Amino acid sequence: MKTKVAAIYGKRDVRLREFELPEITDNELLVSVISDSVCLSTWKAALLGSEHKRVPDDLENHPVITGHECAGVIVEVGKNLTDKYKKGQRFVLQPAMGLPSGYSAGYSYEYFGGNATYMIIPEIAINLGCVLPYHGSYFAAASLAEPMCCIIGAYHANYHTTQYVYEHRMGVKPGGNIALLACAGPMGIGAIDYAINGGIQPSRVVVVDIDEKRLAQVQKLLPVELAASKGIELVYVNTKGMSDPVQMLRSLTGDAGFDDIFVYAAVPAVVEMADELLAEDGCLNFFAGPTDKNFKVPFNFYNVHYNSTHVVGTSGGSTDDMKEAIALSATGQLQPSFMVTHIGGLDAVPETVLNLPDIPGGKKLIYNGVTMPLTAIADFAEKGKTDPLFKELARLVEETHGIWNEQAEKYLLAQFGVDIGEAVQ
């Protein structure tokens, strides 16, 4: 089977590549990858090349396919797997394999990654339960289950303690105060959505950022009134220019501090602020992954000793987290499409990945069977004045107030003749 992929050849070197895949073994799957949402972690891998902990050497001869937030359709089933999978079945990939090497899809494999028209899912990924049946029909939601899975996993990884009781209580504090720092970006939107609609029931959620445009957009998507209807106080705060943001934010809790804090940017000042905002037994989750292996920040160890403050760091999520993300999306409790601001085809991947931090907006969603430059959804109407494809896409997203949706996805895929398989029960 001939495939077309976006692959990492070295530091800051991402190229399109077209080649013949080898025949699958009896314990492998050949799949068509319909969609892949671009993760900042992919940019980090492209930036560092083989210096990245998950990226192997010899990229020039064995380039690795980018992308891991993907979903698609099974095309061919190895003969030893026919009792579990069938041709035409839709799937979503759980890329967190948990291998000692750190290897996973989108970082480490020549034939296994989300930015591909076709890829081979290896035996090890299948044995680890990384191929989940997808019973829905909206591939964007399936791709976005992976970033939502990471967000959900972070909430589950936080913990709290009772003095002289030597078992941690996992998860955020019920009825507690949550602070989401640097959290008006694409992943932040998912974190706010889960805090409000994921059933964890904090009493207060404070969202902090310094980008007023991003804050205004997320307030439209997740208004304070929605949170209030669920018994949650939601507060959006722009700390840019504040003389003492810590004092202001602590005042929102009566100076008690925050029980659970999630840091969504690897910026020393943000981590230091999080430390100062912790309540007694407060848990700081360092969600953002730094590229600097020597990233260090001062931390108040007086409070660690006397106030039981503590830190966790999370990357990825479990299969159960992924299943929760899919289920909450299917019922409409979570709206992962809120994160998406740009749509593109496979041809757009190299430039998108290499310039990701400099492209404004939220998640960039790629359809591998489509040829299309990366385009902001907000620009569809203008482009539609001269291009009938964008004219119809603009009409379809207008029905959901500018949010990407299943109808728009189906129309786009149909225009390029992409086979979307079937939902196998």
Report each predicted region and the residues it spans:
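C-terminal hydrophobic helical "lid"/dimerization subdomain
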Residues: 162, 220, 243-250, 256, ...
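Adenosine-nucleotide cofactor-binding segment
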Residues: 175-177, 181, 192-270, 393
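Helix-to-beta-strand junctions that scaffold the AdoMet/dcAdoMet cofactor pocket
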Residues: 278-280
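Rossmann-fold NAD(P)-binding glycine/threonine-rich loop
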Residues: 269-272, 276, 288-308
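Glycine-rich beta-strand-centered segment in the early N-terminal region that forms part
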Residues: 22-37, 51-100, 113, 125, ...
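Short N-terminal strand-loop motif that marks the start
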Residues: 1-66, 400-425
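NAD(P)H dinucleotide-binding glycine-rich loop of Rossmann-like/cofactor-binding domains
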Residues: 95-177
